[in-house]
Amino acid sequence: MSTPDPPLGGTPRPGPSPGPGPSPGAMLGPSPGPSPGSAHSMMGPSPGPPSAGHPMPTQGPGGYPQDNMHQMHKPMESMHEKGMPDDPRYNQMKGMGMRSGAHTGMAPPPSPMDQHSQGYPSPLGGSEHASSPVPASGPSSGPQMSSGPGGAPLDGSDPQALGQQNRGPTPFNQNQLHQLRAQIMAYKMLARGQPLPDHLQMAVQGKRPMPGMQQQMPTLPPPSVSATGPGPGPGPGPGPGPGPAPPNYSRPHGMGGPNMPPPGPSGVPPGMPGQPPGGPPKPWPEGPMANAAAPTSTPQKLIPPQPTGRPSPAPPAVPPAASPVMPPQTQSPGQPAQPAPLVPLHQKQSRITPIQKPRGLDPVEILQEREYRLQARIAHRIQELENLPGSLAGDLRTKATIELKALRLLNFQRQLRQEVVVCMRRDTALETALNAKAYKRSKRQSLREARITEKLEKQQKIEQERKRRQKHQEYLNSILQHAKDFREYHRSVTGKLQKLTKAVATYHANTEREQKKENERIEKERMRRLMAEDEEGYRKLIDQKKDKRLAYLLQQTDEYVANLTELVRQHKAAQVAKEKKKKKKKKKAENAEGQTPAIGPDGEPLDETSQMSDLPVKVIHVESGKILTGTDAPKAGQLEAWLEMNPGYEVAPRSDSEESGSEEEEEEEEEEQPQPAQPPTLPVEEKKKIPDPDSDDVSEVDARHIIENAKQDVDDEYGVSQALARGLQSYYAVAHAVTERVDKQSALMVNGVLKQYQIKGLEWLVSLYNNNLNGILADEMGLGKTIQTIALITYLMEHKRINGPFLIIVPLSTLSNWAYEFDKWAPSVVKVSYKGSPAARRAFVPQLRSGKFNVLLTTYEYIIKDKHILAKIRWKYMIVDEGHRMKNHHCKLTQVLNTHYVAPRRLLLTGTPLQNKLPELWALLNFLLPTIFKSCSTFEQWFNAPFAMTGEKVDLNEEETILIIRRLHKVLRPFLLRRLKKEVEAQLPEKVEYVIKCDMSALQRVLYRHMQAKGVLLTDGSEKDKKGKGGTKTLMNTIMQLRKICNHPYMFQHIEESFSEHLGFTGGIVQGLDLYRASGKFELLDRILPKLRATNHKVLLFCQMTSLMTIMEDYFAYRGFKYLRLDGTTKAEDRGMLLKTFNEPGSEYFIFLLSTRAGGLGLNLQSADTVIIFDSDWNPHQDLQAQDRAHRIGQQNEVRVLRLCTVNSVEEKILAAAKYKLNVDQKVIQAGMFDQKSSSHERRAFLQAILEHEEQDEEEDEVPDDETVNQMIARHEEEFDLFMRMDLDRRREEARNPKRKPRLMEEDELPSWIIKDDAEVERLTCEEEEEKMFGRGSRHRKEVDYSDSLTEKQWLKAIEEGTLEEIEEEVRQKKSSRKRKRDSEAGSSTPTTSTRSRDKDEESKKQKKRGRPPAEKLSPNPPNLTKKMKKIVDAVIKYKDSSGRQLSEVFIQLPSRKELPEYYELIRKPVDFKKIKERIRNHKYRSLNDLEKDVMLLCQNAQTFNLEGSLIYEDSIVLQSVFTSVRQKIEKEDDSEGEESEEEEEGEEEGSESESRSVKVKIKLGRKEKAQDRLKGGRRRPSRGSRAKPVVSDDDSEEEQEEDRSGSGSEED
């Protein structure tokens, strides 16, 4: 063994390669993991020995057979004997031996292939059970001690025992092992090209052992010591499987794993650190300190391992300082490996037991394992095929046999293939393989080959050309591709830009949304402050917003309120000055006379005729101080005599509240008058010093005073004391500067006690009196405005000693009610009801002149008519009931009161202060306070913007609307007091209103459709002698005709007459159930009224048209309903009797039939609890007035208001217009909450709710069924059940009738002349138009007098005196005499004509009376009337203003339709003065009223077309007043000419007034017959159309006059 064999027969390669040798054994690569065992050692306990069928050969180190391992140990022993333990080859072989020790006794489990490879040798010829090279995947579980068979720890110093423990019996002895290690070390050094030292050569040859090798092994510590030694390791990890720890082990140099450090600078292996300089060589160091010092001795820097593709396992459980294995230092490429210097042999090295790193993946072993598995599968398949059953099918058995033989041939085929390959390799020579050209033979070129070469060259050129073309094509394709890429790039860029743009837009949208939210938040905050009346905060937010419009509105409001405040101050100062002047004048007169007559309590001298003589005078006993008041006190007229009879008494001094002011107060006021800047003086009670509430000495009175002041601080503008105490000159505080507390009613009021809210109203009225102001008491209808007025009068009489006279102007219908209330509440007040005939009124004149009365009650008509009597009295107070009658500033009543009557204090009573427009409200305020509210245009300019229906340039938003409405509330609040029933009268039952939609009958639908489309009414043709063929009749005022059709089609007389013939009735009148079948509203009444009568509910039924009331009377007679009727023709004295009869507890009348205008004012009908409004009024307040006849104080039951409305008709439009007008009223009046106690927050919340309510949808247009109607009219469940049973009984009864008909008329029941298509109606209409134009003969007209026979005053007088028929007869006789006179004058003017010709003319005139062609001239008017008309028109045309400009210049002639087409589109009836003059010449006007109508129409057209405030608009208003004044002047001149006696004066006045009324009542000649028929109980058809119109006073607005005139046909038909 002189020559050391290289282990495993590998040939060492020279060079610096650090890689392993060519051995394919266990040294194929290092294991990177911490476990030195195989992968099988981590998969659980090792299985038992292999089966007997698979004997395993004896394995040596590294998994090799024992014989191979024996060959490897021979060189190791020789190296050990030669003393070469330091040789690298020795260490390498020793490492191989240690690696094999790790696998000893731990053979891998048999693979699945081993169980089936029965007798088949391995194709590779190696061991079939080589250890798997798979690294351990789990970290170490901690240090474990290796134990022997007895469980005792093994000593690492005994290698033989270690080897036997690890590998079983081994053939190597100790010397052989040393020699093997030396050979391994030598192999390593030779592989690196390093020279072998002598001792290593000797050790390799086995001559002597390596120095230090003998000492190395015994000194090695056991593996447990190194594993558990101290050190700051990273913590224990899960160790490898149950395999024992490896022995001392050192990897060969250059084959270290990735975690091994490089060798040191002295060539010492990593586990053997060099000796420190200057010290002798030491033996093996003991303890871990040497291990810790080992890495510090290497000067090279340690480089961490490079990461690999596999996850590295956790580090071993060895402290880093004690670990002999360090990370390798990666050698940079290109750097030659420097040979390490040899270590001196005598150097003692410290050897530490290394820990085996896990092996890496071995691809050879993986391949082997794959082969094993294939072999196993093949063997398994052969076994399956051999064991196939014999019953298999033939073809399957053949296939299985073929497969079995093929599998058995596999090994033979593999052996044959190997042999063929070996033979082929032997044929290959060494030189041929190295140099292929060495034996190449040169070839000669022949001619044939030259041609071939040429041909090939040509082919080559073609090929080159083809390649060139192909290259060019590729170039073009690349260009196209580039273009495509270019487009794609820019498309992507564009897409990115679009995305960016979208993102920017989204950002801005989000930003804008956020900004909008912020603005909305600020706006809500602003609205909140505005609603809370936080004016300071609101102004700050307005300044932040920079809203010029809102700031401008606030500025305007401040300026306007400041101006009004100043005007109120001036008004009060002027009133005070007047009072002073009057008192001074009276005092001077008394001083001049030198004697003082008897002075009454009011400071006036007393006489027998004084109006103060009947009032009690308060007296006091001088000694006892006893005061006598009321009935115990003496009368004023008997005061002196009573004082003589009762000595010791004298007149009691008047209190401060009773006196209007003493002389000292007058002097103080004179001194204070030149100082307007000072706040108004506080009352005596408020001038007291308010004590400090924090002080201890606060009396009970002072505490109560403090509480009152705190209570007044709650509201903003009603806290007068608080405002004055702060020195704030608020508008309301200035107006109501003087306050007086009223706790109870006057002692003169008896038979009842005022409610608390009525006491508050009285206090407000007294405050108006004390502050010299006038106001509007606008409590809702039914809250007792009459009682509060009587309380004011009695309070003034008792406490202020103002005994009158008081003028109270009321409607005629409520005059009796006022007299009744005075008799009940204040019987001691002397009242005069100024009404009746002229003789009766004249009887009151002496009493009026003497002044022996306190109150005068009269009507609007007598105020105008008897102004020469009533205006002579100086009234202390003027009170106008239903003050909204003065809503037109130009109405006659307002002008007469302003010009003729003297009354320093005025009061208006109205339940509806705002009915249609804001100028109406201004008219009321102007009448009350003309010095404060001067200009209507200014008032409208300030407050009309939110309510203007046309001409509004900019729509106001909600906030601006609230600001403007709030401005109006500020203006109105001092002068208007309004309380609602729901606020002040809690015990008043609820009022519920329902709108019940009614369907139309077939007759109504047909008539309505043609009237709506063409404006014509279908007839049967009888008026044209085409009876039964049908015809049409054109009617004016289509809306009125549509309303009549909706109410009842029989309101048209010819329709009822035709249907009476069609249905078989005689007399032209329809009776029975066909009365209600023709109208949807009547059919609904037929279902409702029996239920109401059965449950004892009294009904008020309001109608607009008197002819409809007549038809309704026929229906009531048919059903047997007891009823009462009240309309405009009912006398005043009869009205009271009707009310009394209806209100009696046991009255048999359960229906009261009233007209809305006549029966809607001042009537107390609280015994009824159901109100049915048959047809709605254009003015919603008329309907509200009508409802409140039942819903007023004294009502005990819940009130149901049922408003009937025909579905899809003009009535829905009327209802919508009424709602709009009510909406205006809500915004202005109700939202102001002028009730003296509502706080600002409540007012703002109410206004906000109104504005939000506008956005709600309207109700659906559907006709309710019986159940829904029953729910509307039933008050409780029992009534509802009863009504449902009644409906069921009614339907059963109708079903039993064999001749039953539908509830409403069907189309198949209509006559043929009604059912016409549109084309036929168009043809009939054209025929009628042609007849009108060309005059085909005269039509038969009924004898109806259309002239104005009586004025309204004459008619009222005749009604009151009961001489209507006689006066009408006289008028007819006068007309006939005038007519004969005109005829005689015409005959005398033509004396040459014969009598015969004159008789013929008269006959022709009589014939022409029946029907005249349109082209024929009208009969001439009286010359006096024509002269008046011309005079009036000329005066209006020539009128000039102060600058000399003629106002009527633009009104003379209108521009043509071509010049101004929009005027004719907007104005339906254009008229000018030229046309008016022409009509006067053609005698078109039959009275001054007709002329006035056209002049007013001209002015209204100008106001409609032109903007408000323009020059033409203002001129038209002036021309209206000029016309009125000129007409009055001319009428007065006529009146003065005929005054000869008082009787004649009365007659002449009534005669002249016949042409001064704006609305005429047309009396038909058949009235007498009608009255007789009604007395007899029968009814003639003309009676339905011969009712007179309700009385409409001429103080109504022009707009309502026109509506009433246009509706005259509806009430007369």
UniProtKB/Swiss-Prot annotation:
The modification Phosphothreonine is found at residues 11, 353, 609, 1390. The modification N6-acetyllysine is found at residues 188, 626. Residues 24-45, 130-147 have a biased composition (Low complexity). The keyword Cell division does not apply. Residues 658-673, 1533-1553, 1593-1603 have a biased composition (Acidic residues). Keywords: Acetylation, Activator, Bromodomain, Chromatin regulator, Hydrolase, Isopeptide bond, Neurogenesis, Nucleus, Phosphoprotein, Repressor, RNA-binding, Transcription, Transcription regulation, Ubl conjugation. GO terms for cellular component: bBAF complex; chromatin; euchromatin; GBAF complex; kinetochore; male germ cell nucleus; nBAF complex; npBAF complex. PROSITE patterns: BROMODOMAIN_1, BROMODOMAIN_2, HELICASE_ATP_BIND_1, HELICASE_CTER, HSA, QLQ. GO terms for molecular function: ATP binding; ATP hydrolysis activity; ATP-dependent chromatin remodeler activity; chromatin binding; DNA polymerase binding; helicase activity; histone binding; lncRNA binding. Residues 1-282 are annotated as: Necessary for interaction with SS18L1/CREST. It holds the Pfam family SNF2-rel_dom. This is SWI/SNF-related matrix-associated actin-dependent regulator of chromatin subfamily A member 4. It comes from Mus musculus (Mouse). The gene is Smarca4.
